[in-house]
Every structure is written in structure tokens, then in C-alpha cells.
């Protein structure tokens, strides 16, 4: 089991609406070949969004703060074939962040 917590910074201030966040999170899930069960997203006013995709393997959530040019992400996966390093790379590339600081928390 692997748990990734991270913050994407720089170049992500454009994530002001829920549609862009939802599409990007879906791309991450599909690229990592994870299995979506359901999803919920919310648009904040005047800008910013939050979302969670419930996975058969666990969950993927993200919270945008366009005013700070940051997105916080949380990906938990119970698949034995899951690579935290690959997941972090996919997240950084799909969100097109200048920097992705992340931590891998091993779960038993």
C-alpha cells in the first residue's frame, strides 16, 4: 500500500475551474490504469475547486488554490503493482507543474 501526499506549485494558477481539475485527475487515473468507482467535485467562488475520485484501489483527491498557484494532492493506492515514483511523475506531468514536492507514506 502506498500513500502519496504532495503540493504542486508554479504554473498551476490556471486551475480555477472544476472542469479542468476533473479532466486532469481523470487523465492521471487513466494513465496509472486505476479503476474509478465514483467521483465528486465542487467549484468554489470566485475560483478554485476540489475533487475526489474514489478508486477500487482507494482514492485520489485534489484541492486547488489558484491565488497561491498551488494544488494539494492525496493519492492512496492498495495495489501491489503501484509505483509511487511513477505516480508522482504522472501527476506532475498531467498538471504541468513547475515543481511537485511529495512524500510517500508506506502503509501496512
Residue ranges: model-predicted function:
Residues 1-61, 65-108:
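Polybasic/polar functional segments that serve as interface/processing modules
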Amino acid at each position: 500500500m502506498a500513500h502519496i501526499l504532495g503540493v504542486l506549485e508554479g504554473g498551476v494558477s490556471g486551475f480555477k475551474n472544476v472542469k479542468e481539475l476533473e479532466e486532469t485527475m481523470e487523465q492521471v487515473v487513466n494513465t496509472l490504469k486505476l479503476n474509478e468507482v465514483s467521483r465528486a467535485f465542487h467549484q468554489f467562488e470566485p475560483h478554485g475547486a476540489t475533487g475526489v475520485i474514489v478508486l477500487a484501489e482507494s482514492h485520489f483527491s485534489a484541492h486547488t488554490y489558484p491565488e497561491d498557484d498551488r494544488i494539494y494532492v492525496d493519492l492512496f493506492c492498495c495495489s501491489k503493482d503501484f509505483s509511487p515514483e511513477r505516480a508522482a511523475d504522472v501527476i506532475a506531468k498531467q498538471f504541468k507543474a513547475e515543481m511537485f514536492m511529495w512524500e510517500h507514506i508506506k502503509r501496512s
